Structures are given as C-alpha cells and as structure tokens.
C-alpha cells in the first residue's frame, strides 16, 4: 500500500471516531486565538489533565504557547453554527469570530463560551511534537459545567447532535 493511500485510509478511519465538538480559546499577553473542534481527551483526574492536538503549522501555536493557558469549550447541540464559524466553514474572519456574542472571561481570564456544556480552563504544562501536530498537555484549574443542552459530535466529517434520553415522570 502506498504511503499516500495509507494516509487517506487513516484519515477516513479517524472520521469514524466521534469526538465532542470543542472550541479551544486563549487570550493573554501573546494575543487571542481560537482553534476549532480540535481533538482533546482526558489524560488523568489526578491532577485533572487533558491533551489537545493542534496542527504544527497553525499560526495559533505561538499564541497558545506564549499565553501558557487555554480553555476547552465543549459545545452543545445548539452551537453548531458557531462551530461552523470557528472551523472556517462560513468565511468569517478570526477577529469576527471573537466578536460573536456569548463570550465571558473565566476564572483564569480565558474566553469562556456561554452555554457550552463544559468549559475547562487550564495551564499548559507540556508541549510535544508528534508528526504533523503539537500535543499540548493541560492541567485543568477551573471547570464550569452546564446542566442544559445536549451534545454535539463530529462524525464522518459532519456535525451531529447527541440527545440524552429524558426520564419520563409518571
């Protein structure tokens, strides 16, 4: 199998994973940056830590590293349009994306998206280069949770809502 064919098959296989849609934000001395639904996952709960992967060629990396902190905003099913803006699917500029309503400052001063299912603010503890991406290990310092809304995932290169079953009260 050719290397290019293997890469394409790998990408197609990864499109079968269904991660939650996240918007990663940072704002401090090095500037402001927003990264659309990047893969992130829990590493450990002691200390609470996650990993975030960003393409090594992204112009946002110096901003994330310079600020040393970020926020992972887990979008709810009603925030698909916002996810499309941040993914560059609508032609909206980066400055305009931050100009959208719904942002507030979190405990660490990071942009927290109102209505997100969860917002996890943390400090970047390590950055490693693995292939074409930088892997950020982030120690979580502040967590905001919402009891409202359903999930939003990205599966087979499309957004999909994930609805919770509701208990029926007799």
From Swiss-Prot:
Induction pattern: By 3- or 4-hydroxyphenylacetic acid.
Enzyme class: oxidoreductase
Reactions accelerated catalytically: a reduced flavin + NAD(+) = an oxidized flavin + NADH + 2 H(+)
EC number: 1.5.1.36
Molecular function via GO: flavin reductase (NADH) activity; FMN binding; NAD binding; oxidoreductase activity, acting on NAD(P)H; riboflavin reductase (NADPH) activity
InterPro entries: Flavin_Rdtase-like_dom, HPA_mOase_red, NADH-dep_flavin_reductase, Split_barrel_FMN-bd
Keyword ATP-binding: no
GO biological process entries: benzene-containing compound metabolic process; pyrimidine nucleobase catabolic process
Pathway involvement of the protein, from the record: Aromatic compound metabolism; 4-hydroxyphenylacetate degradation; pyruvate and succinate semialdehyde from 4-hydroxyphenylacetate: step 1/7
Coiled coil segments of this chain: none
Top-rank lineage group of the source organism: Bacteria
Keywords attached to this entry: Aromatic hydrocarbons catabolism, Flavoprotein, FMN, NAD, Oxidoreductase
Family statement drawn from the similarity comment of this UniProt entry: Belongs to the non-flavoprotein flavin reductase family. HpaC subfamily.
NCBIfam families according to UniProt: HpaC, PRK15486.1
Binding partners and assembly: Homodimer. 4-HPA 3-monooxygenase consists of a reductase component HpaC and an oxygenase component HpaB.
Role: Catalyzes the reduction of free flavins (FMN, FAD and riboflavin) by NADH. Subsequently, the reduced flavins diffuse to the large HpaB component or to other electron acceptors such as cytochrome c and Fe(3+) ion.
Name of the protein described by the UniProt record: 4-hydroxyphenylacetate 3-monooxygenase reductase component
Organism: Klebsiella oxytoca
Phylogenetic lineage: Bacteria, Pseudomonadati, Pseudomonadota, Gammaproteobacteria, Enterobacterales
